Amino acid sequence: MDQMAKIDEKKPHVVFIPFPAQSHIKCMLKLARILHQKGLYITFINTDTNHERLVASGGTQWLENAPGFWFKTVPDGFGSAKDDGVKPTDALRELMDYLKTNFFDLFLDLVLKLEVPATCIICDGCMTFANTIRAAEKLNIPVILFWTMAACGFMAFYQAKVLKEKEIVPVKDETYLTNGYLDMEIDWIPGMKRIRLRDLPEFILATKQNYFAFEFLFETAQLADKVSHMIIHTFEELEASLVSEIKSIFPNVYTIGPLQLLLNKITQKETNNDSYSLWKEEPECVEWLNSKEPNSVVYVNFGSLAVMSLQDLVEFGWGLVNSNHYFLWIIRANLIDGKPAVMPQELKEAMNEKGFVGSWCSQEEVLNHPAVGGFLTHCGWGSIIESLSAGVPMLGWPSIGDQRANCRQMCKEWEVGMEIGKNVKRDEVEKLVRMLMEGLEGERMRKKALEWKKSATLATCCNGSSSLDVEKLANEIKKLSRN
């Protein structure tokens, strides 16, 4: 209450609503901290379980030095924070069903009870399914959508309604997934040249297995048209033509990435590596890297939601071992179809010589470690923009959501990566790891990655495109809050 006594009720107060997944929370929390540093009050809303996990992993330790920044929670229908035995995607769908039914009333009640009146809402673009825009309208509070993905990912999502209108999707049946139909070039998407249907989010295909996701995607694309302000986690130099096309559709677009580079410039040095993770990060990963030569290690992490079969894990494992390069592999407890990975003993022993296996790590710290020379990734946007910021080339194995579009751009447009086929084979993994770490192609990609690192650094400098857009965003929030 002492802190509340000093509150200036005329100061803008932004309420953040993240999509309840690790990468989205991490991204939105970074922007929230940046805007807090620029003089705005912040309330950040998590589900009960996600906030419990964030606290347990040390993700809120900085809060005592951030007066005017508050966390609030809403129920999620889960009894406790459990990972084991449940596929992350299944748990997420269950959570989305709960929030679609309940979030509207929970949010209204929460906002009306805030001791400082909310003046602006920044909502994850993927959270509109939970009636967030309707809630903002009822409260008469301006809302800004934040797309934590790349411009290419947003444009791919946004085109779902057009693809449906043109009757390209839904696909008629499962045979269309293997009969060459997915190789169709879509040449009319603004800013995306010669992209194939298979490079778009697989949710768009609307097979029986993912029709729920297609409906979510279609609804999300429609609701994007209802707002006048939009934030995208990219930098203009990386996706110039796409950003230009998006700005021709939407009146107010802010490109504010890479967020970590911006955060590094305004937070105290000792807090730059604060965790934003729902998992406990293992310092042993970095300690192991400290003993390795520069550019000698492949970092492997398939993100927080992707799952794979034990067969895929074994193929990746032998491919890494046979490449004869050091590797740091993050294997989550629920990576194998939602269950702990039980690795064959022969592979486990073979991996001990060159590999180090951890359950989670500080990814930005790892990618910026001099020992890391390549990144085998699921192509989640958070991972790609962090890798570009560190100047690290990639191998991509995309799975869900925007990852296919990200991988396509990474390989074809930004020229910093190569794709591993969906059906994982150890020989292909070995070959591509060798190309990445020791071949001319890897050398070329590393040089290109370092060029993008320089561009990202310039974008986040004092007069860089992203720095200027953050200032514009903060000023616009202040303006919206006065109206």
UniProtKB/Swiss-Prot annotation:
Gene this protein is translated from: UGT85C1
Protein function: May glycosylate diterpenes or flavonols in leaves.
Top-rank taxon: Eukaryota
CDD domains with a match to the protein in the record: GT1_Gtf-like
Protein keywords: Glycosyltransferase, Transferase
Protein name per the record: UDP-glycosyltransferase 85C1
SUPFAM superfamilies in UniProt: UDP-Glycosyltransferase/glycogen phosphorylase
Family to which the UniProt record says this protein belongs: Belongs to the UDP-glycosyltransferase family.
Single GO molecular function: quercetin 7-O-glucosyltransferase activity
Binding site for UDP-alpha-D-glucose: 304, 360-361, 378-386, 400-403
EC number: 2.4.1.-
